[in-house]
């Protein structure tokens, strides 16, 4: 990134209303406890509507029936989304059985949704079941604290089934970082777990009384796999190993994908390299990055509040030097690392510990019993007999991890019998969408419900041009907030209106380049016509091993985004 003209360290001006809300919330309590007992509405009112996000929930409604209910003079069918805190995506089979039961008994949709932030979500929790879901999670050692709003969100960690020892070490650091950066308020325990109020003053030594200016995302990544899409995240620890043992991390700061349609002050940005740090400085550096963003992030304009904008305003070097000062270290030069891919290896892989790992492709992460494919039942049956753990991947898939040779055949039989190992194309394996309609209030266009049939059509184009076994990293996101990570795809569709998308092209397979908008506000037939032409050219003109995104840049079809603060919108 270029150093333009470093701006002020702190943005002066009228604070956004979110800052007032946080300050007046009494460390995230608000009047949530009282609101829970209000049976006149299925939702949360006033500030509580936003405060529940700090407790891992979003208030939603079923948009498919919103107009129908309005015509009947009924309020929207309010229900909550709850997102679990699950560092590194590791969940025990006991925990899985508990969440399976809750989804079946206490949610409108009966499904478990794996997310590309390596955790699971429940959709459709009615207000009466909100407290029980938190208590259920607590009973099996889980919680939903800090999985939404202005905190450090769920910490990702590469789901690496090969280097078992290295994964174990990296995963422990993901957990340590997650715990270190958690809020200290007792609001969560008091409201949801009925723990007594303690007569002490709440303090937030890391996050502060008004928490962070905006959401903050952290990863621990083990090269050569970039499955966690580090450039979508504020703070990234890239594992550096010697002789198979973790010795330290390269730190990259300031990635982020969300934009606002037409707002040229917003842009997607890849993360900047700060340097290498030995393991013993990890928590101090993590805290220093977070507190620097806490103090310097823009609290007057939430559209410009993320770390990526702070870096561009103050300058990368200035931010880095402040992190060094706060952490009491000097970064060493970046150590060599390389990424070769970011997809999951579907199927069986043997780890170096002689245990087997079975990665199951779960289209769009939606676990439900479909006609002829009872996925949810199948995973429950596996959970009942499996001695190891499950790992949720950042590609919305699920790994049955650490399977001994003696159990391999039984687990494979269960998986096959329940439609969990059906053959799918490489293209489908490398396609992903956010939830969008009907539950997301921000959705502008379909995503999860659109992608399967759209993928069928892209597969047909690949077949037509003689490359059916090829794949293009393809993502669909229902709005420009970018949960589907379309801004790191080779083909990225960003919802603009019902049935209409902005088409972005020119990302790469390893997720290190932002795609540029190729066509704006177009329909599915227009998108497919463009892809038919370009994929045809790629099939004929590509160099050996050249991915679709790299081809579009080399062929001059797309001008690469090199400095997004300056050229993202050009």
Curated annotation (Swiss-Prot):
Gene3D superfamilies: Sulfite Reductase Hemoprotein, domain 1
GO biological processes: cysteine biosynthetic process; hydrogen sulfide biosynthetic process; sulfate assimilation
Alphabetized GO MF terms: 4 iron, 4 sulfur cluster binding; heme binding; metal ion binding; NADP binding; sulfite reductase (ferredoxin) activity; sulfite reductase (NADPH) activity
Cofactor note: Binds 1 siroheme per subunit. Binds 1 [4Fe-4S] cluster per subunit.
GO cellular component, one term: sulfite reductase complex (NADPH)
Enzyme Commission number, as recorded: 1.8.1.2
Reactions catalysed: hydrogen sulfide + 3 NADP(+) + 3 H2O = sulfite + 3 NADPH + 4 H(+)
Keyword terms: 4Fe-4S, Amino-acid biosynthesis, Cysteine biosynthesis, Heme, Iron, Iron-sulfur, Metal-binding, NADP, Oxidoreductase
Keyword hit for Aminoacyl-tRNA synthetase: no
UniProt-annotated binding residues for [4Fe-4S] cluster: 434, 440, 479, 483
Co-factor requirement: siroheme; [4Fe-4S] cluster
Family matches, as Pfam families: NIR_SIR, NIR_SIR_ferr
Chain residues that bind siroheme: 483
Pathway listed: Sulfur metabolism; hydrogen sulfide biosynthesis; hydrogen sulfide from sulfite (NADPH route): step 1/1
InterPro entries for the chain: CysI (IPR011786), NiRdtase/SiRdtase_haem-b_fer (IPR005117), Nit/Sulf_reduc_fer-like_dom_sf (IPR036136), NO2/SO3_Rdtase_4Fe4S_dom (IPR006067), NO2/SO3_Rdtase_4Fe4S_prot (IPR045169), NO2/SO3_Rdtase_4Fe4S_sf (IPR045854), NO2/SO3_Rdtase_FeS/sirohaem_BS (IPR006066)
Family: Belongs to the nitrite and sulfite reductase 4Fe-4S domain family.
HAMAP family attached to this UniProt entry: CysI
Role according to the record: Component of the sulfite reductase complex that catalyzes the 6-electron reduction of sulfite to sulfide. This is one of several activities required for the biosynthesis of L-cysteine from sulfate.
Quaternary context: Alpha(8)-beta(8). The alpha component is a flavoprotein, the beta component is a hemoprotein.
Protein name stated in the entry: Sulfite reductase [NADPH] hemoprotein beta-component
Organism of this sequence: Salmonella newport (strain SL254)
